[in-house]
Amino acid sequence: MFASLDTPAVHQRKKYEFTPIGHIKEKENMIAQELRQNKRPPLEDEEDAAIEGNYMKRTRVGDDTMNSQQLFNETSFDDTLPEQTLQGISAIKKNLAPELLSNDNKEKAELASNPLKEQQHALQKLNMENYSLRVKCNSLLKFLNNVTDDGKLKQGLEMLDELQEWKTKHHELIQRFKELQLRYDELEQREPEPLKVAEPADHSHCEKLRAELETSLKETRSQLDEVQATVSTLEKRLVEVKKDYSEKEHQYKMSLDIAKSENNRLTSSLSSREDALNEAQEKINRLMVQLEEFDHTSGSLLELEKKIDDKNQGIRNLETRLQELNFHRQDLERQLLTANETIEALKKEHEEYREQNELKLTSLHKNTSGEDRLRKQLRDLAEDKEGLQKLRQTLEERNKELDERVEALESQVAAIEEDRQKIIGEQQQVVRNLKLEHQKRAQNLKREIEELRELNQQLEETNRSYKKRFEHFSRNSPARKATQEELTAKDREIGALKRTIRDIEESVLRTTRELETAKIQHRREKSMLEARLDQAASEEPFERSRLEKEISMLKLEIRSIQDTKERELSLWESKYESLKNTYEKLLQQDKHSNLNEILEDRREELKSLMKKYNDLTTENLELTRELNKQKSHKEAYKEDLRKVQARLDFITKEFVKLKESAPEPKDSSDELNSKWMEKYQNMKIKLLNELKVLQDENIQLERRLLDRSQQQSHNLAETPTQSRDSSLQDKVDYYRLKYHDEVRKNNDLRVINEYLNRVLKASSQHLKLDILKLENEISPLNSSTTYINDYDYSYAPSYYSRRGRPLKFKTVAIFVLSCIRMYQATLRRRWDQQRINYLQRKIAYGEDRITW
C-alpha cells in the first residue's frame, strides 16, 4: 500500500485527504473506481457530446424550450375570435380614463416612494426580457439549423409578418372604435340647452354629426369583419405550414437516431479490440515523461529561486551598506566637529605654550642648564602640530567625498523632476482631449435643444390655427362648450410640451455638469493609476534602493528642518523675553489705571479667543468624522454603481449579440431597441443624478472644512510653530508606517517562497519514490508466468472500508490557532492602513491642497 498525489474534482474531495504537498488517496480505491467507470456502458447523450466535441452541460429531460416550436404558434388572438355584440351604449362604461389614471398613479407612487425598489423592479424586467429574447434566438437558430430551407421557411416568415401587420391594424381599428363610442357618449351626456318659447332651436348640426358617426361606425364594422376573415385565412395557412414542419422534423430525428446507433456499434467494436497491457504501458510512459518534465521544471524553478534569493541578499546587503554609510557619515560629521574643537583647544594650548616658552627662554638665557629641556619640549610641540595637520587633511578629504555624494544625489533628484514634468505634460494632453470631447457633446446637445425649440414653435403655430378654427365654429354652432373644452385641452397639452422642453433643457445642463464631474473623476483615476504604476515599477531593486536613498535624504531634511525650527523657537523666545522686560519697565514707569484696564481687556479677549479655538477644534473633529462617514458612503455607492454599470454593460453586450445573430431587422425589433435604449438612458440618468448629489455633498463638506481651517489659521496666526511641528510629526509617522508595511510584505513573500520551495522538493521526492515502487511491483508481474488474479488477502474488510485517517486534536488546534493569528494580522493591517490614509489626508489638508 502506498499513497499517490492527485488533484481531485469537487464531488470527489471526500475520498481524499489534504496535506501541504497535495491530496492523497489509496491505490486500491482508485483502481476500483476506474473499474467501476469502465464497467458502466456509455450513454447516448455522452457519446453524442464526445463525437460533436461540445462540452456543454446536458439540458434537462423536461425542458423543451430549445426544441419547441411554440414561438411560431404564439399569437395575440384567441383560437376563435369573439363576436362583437354591440350592447346598449348605456351598458358600456363611459369614462375609463380616471380608473386607469388612478391605477397608474398608485403604481408610480409605490415605486417613487422607494427608488431602490424601482431600480430593482426595472432590472428584473430587463432580465426577464433579456432571457425571453435569448430563448427565442436560441430556438430560432436551432430550428434554422435543423430544417432545410426549400422556400417554405421564407413563406412562413412572410406570413408571420403579414399576421403582425393585420394585428396592428386590428388594434388601431379597435382604438378608433372606442374613441368614437366615447365621443358619442359625451354627446349624449351633454344636457340640452333650455329651449326658448319664441325661437325654436336648430339641431341640424347634431343630426349631421350623428349621421357621420353612424356611417363611420358602419365602416369600422365592415373593416373589422374583413380583418377577422383575413386573420382566419392566415391562421389556416399557418396550421398547414406547421404540419409540414413537424413532418420534416420527424424525418430528421429518425435519420439522427440511425446515425447514433451506427456510431455506438463502431465505438463498441473499437473498445473491445483494445488491450489492458497497452493501456498500462501507456500510463507508465506518461508518468515517466511527466517525471522528467517535472524534474526539469523543478530544476529551473530552483535556479530561479536561487537567483531571486541572491538578488534579495544583494538588496539587503546594499540596504545594510547604505545604513552603514549613513552612520559612518554621521560619525565622520561628529568626528569633524570634535576635531575642530580639539584643533581650537590645541591652538589655545599652543599659544599658552608659546607664551610659557618665551618666559622660560628668558629665564633659560640666564640659566644655561635648562636648554636641553626646552629643546625636548619644542620637538614634542612640533610633532603634535604635524599630527594635527594630518588629521585636518583627512577630515577635509572626507568632507570632499561627502560633497560629491550630495551632488550625485542632487542630479538624481533633477532626473526625477524631469520625469515628473513629462508625466504632467501627458496629463495636460489628456485633459485637452477631454475638453474637445466635452465641446463636441455640448454642441450636439445644443443642436437637440434648437430642434426642440423649432418643434415648440411649430406646435404653437398649429395651436393658433386650431384656436382660429374653433372660434369660427363656435360663432356659427350652438355646441360652444365642447369647443372651449377642446381648446383648454389643447392649451394643457401645449403647457405640458413646454414643461417637457424645460425639463430637457435642465437635463442638458445636468449632463454638462456631469460631464465636467466625469472629467474630474477621470483625472483623479488617471493620477491614481499612474501612482500605482509608479509603485509597481519601484519594486525593482535599483529603483527600490533609489527610493530608500530618497527616504534617508528626507529624514535628514526633516532633522535639519527640526534644528532650524528649534533655533527659530529659541530666537522667538529671546525676543519674547526682551519684549516682556521692556513691557515691565514701561509698566513700572507709567503706573496709570488705563494701562491696567487695557491689560484686563486684552486678557479677556485672549480667553474668548481660546474658547473659540477650542470650539473650532471640536467642530473640526466633528467635520472630519462626518467627512470620513460621507467618504465611506461614497465608496459604498461607488461599488453599487460599478455593479449596476457592469450589469448594464453585460445586458447591452448580450443585446448587441442577439441583434447580430437575429434575422433581418423589422419594425418590432426597432421598437424593442428603442424601448431598451430608453430604459438604459433612464437608468443611466438616475444613477448619474445620485452620483452628482453625492459629489455635491462631498464638495460642500470639503469647502466647509477648508473654511474652518482658514478661520483657524487667521485666529491662530500667533502660534505657527505648533502646527508646523504637528505636520512634521505626521509626516514622520506616515513614512515610518509605510516603511513597516513594506518590511512586512517582504517578510511574508520570503516565508511563502520558502514554503513553496519545501513543498516542491518534498513532492518531487514523493513522486520519485512512488515511481520506483511502481517499477518494482510491475517488473516481476510482467516476467512471471504463474501470475493469477486470485489472491488470499490477509487484511480484514474493515481495513479497506476506511476512507482516510481520522483527524487528531493537535491538527484541529493548530488550525484554529492559525486562523486566530491570521485574523489578528488582518486587523493590524487594517488599522495601519486606516492610520496611513488618515495621515495622508491630514498632511494634504495641512498643505492647503486637495488630493481626492
From Swiss-Prot:
Q: Name one Pfam family in it.
A: Nuf2_DHR10-like
Asked if 4Fe-4S is a keyword of the record, the answer is no
InterPro entries (UniProt xref) = Nuf2_DHR10-like, Spc110_C
Q: Where in the cell is it found?
A: Nucleus; Cytoplasm, Cytoskeleton, Microtubule organizing center, Spindle pole body
Keywords from the UniProt entry: Coiled coil, Cytoplasm, Cytoskeleton, Nucleus
**Any coiled-coil regions, as ranges:** 158-711
Cellular component (GO) terms are:
chromatin; condensed chromosome; condensin complex; cytoplasm; nucleus; spindle pole body
| Molecular function GO terms recorded | chromatin binding
| GO biological process assignments | mitotic chromosome condensation
Q: What function is annotated for this protein?
A: Component of the spindle pole body (SPB) required for the proper execution of spindle pole body (SPB) duplication. Potential role in cross-linking filaments or anchoring other molecules. It is essential for growth.
Sequence similarity: Belongs to the SPC110 family.
Spell out the subunit comment: Homodimer.
What is this protein called in UniProt? Spindle pole body component 110
Please report the organism this UniProt entry assigns to the protein: Eremothecium gossypii (strain ATCC 10895 / CBS 109.51 / FGSC 9923 / NRRL Y-1056) (Yeast)
